[in-house]
Amino acid sequence: FYDAAVGVNDDNFGGIIKSPLDLMIGTFRLFNIQLPSHTTSPTEYYENTSDLIRQLTLMGMHFYEPFDVAGYDAYHQYPIYHRAWISTNYLTNRYDFIRQLVSQNPNMPDPLRIDPVDFVRNKIPVATAANARTLIIELAKYFLPLADNLTFDTAADDTAGLTAERLNYFLTAFLKSPQLDPDPEASWTIRWNNPVDPEVVRRQLENLFNAMM
């Protein structure tokens, strides 16, 4: 395998679709989300885990209850294998799961929510975060499997881990959905460097995290 082209081909890195459980656990690890203690807060613990199991079901993984004795189709069903995790409904619910995590959504318990503002402040240097484009490139290193040689220039992205078109999509979701300012990137820099419009900053980061995750 390691001598074969498929074993060393960069295009194959990050190519397997994660199970809903992989997606959930990986996201919680990245953001250091902790469940309430099952010994000191059992009610909250079981409420939270019950909600997470419900989310897994919505994303296509009936936890410990596969449809047949062979297990989950994604692990054995030729020829689709891991693609079995994706259907129109399952994909929509994956998007919705992330949206609930990063937004102020009452359906997601407080201990399980992600605070995008705190994450950027704690993980990204101030000067990097103040520039919308360098912020996106830096976040890609956390969120995406391939983040080398990233550029927003469509004429210079041949060796990039992501296309410039994809990065520009993230930029549009970040600052132009909706566009609040004539110069969105300059306005982002002002808002990040100064304690003004914190709610706008939060909403824009929520949009960015939702698009990238």
Model-predicted segments: where are they?
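Flexible, low-complexity segments enriched for small/polar residues
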Residues: 1-213
